[in-house]
Amino acid sequence: MTILDQLAGCARERTGQAKLRISLEELKQQELSLPKGNFTFEKAIKKPGLSFICECKKASPSKGIIAQEFPYLQIAKDYEVAGADCISVLTEPKWFLGSDQYLKKIADAVSVPCLRKDFTVDEYMIYEAKVLGASAVLLICSILSEEQIKEYISICDELGLSALVETHDECEVRMALNAGARMIGVNNRNLKDFSVDTGNSRRFRKLIPPDVLFVSESGVSSAEDVRKLCEIGADAVLIGETLMRAENKAAKLAELRGVL
């Protein structure tokens, strides 16, 4: 069983427990009381030039604790001031030590759109993301079927949420396109052995048509990495560990954005 399988299994357990507290129908009623989203995450990434999705992440399965001190609200506000276009918030509690409350409080505190970074395995989690204040959800091809991705994108469309469809290889890129993804992320991290190869983004970029937004995820640590992604025509880059390990996150983001 891969780490992704374990993460997906835990997400199913969490969702099952959440449904005991609030049913899907009750959650849908909560969502109906909110204004419809207007795809602000996609709009932020569509702007000219490379967009930066900056991540609030305390830990990861590959690196363990990344940030002993985790003033998540201040981190998110610093990202916004430093020019982040979007903010990614981990809500997976076991391996990433994330929390739904982190997302809710960050979404309330900043004006840039937020991505709920979690392992979406049930439509419940999409409605939950909207109620928590997210503007986008992550759909990972490795743990979903093409039909599920298609169904979840349709639900996102109804709610005005953006769906970032994450891929790891050529087969998954084609699967995402077949499912109607408008925004595809290529994860440069191999989730079987945690190795990182930013060449993934370069190799798979050519498979993604120009009318589909292209996001490079993981492994970006230098201005040179950013420059190379600009050259291949990436629309956005998602940066987590590099920023989280920086003592001055705003300065690090400014350094990475400086090549633009």
State each model region's role.
Residues 2-69:
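An N-cap/entry alpha-helix motif that binds or orients negatively charged groups
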Residues 203-207, 230, 245-260:
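C-terminal helical cap(s) of enzyme catalytic domains, especially alpha/beta-barrels
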Residues 7, 54, 79, 129, ...:
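Conserved, mostly hydrophobic/aromatic
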Residues 128-148, 185-194, 232-252:
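Glycine-rich phosphate-binding active-site loops on the catalytic face of alpha/beta enzymes
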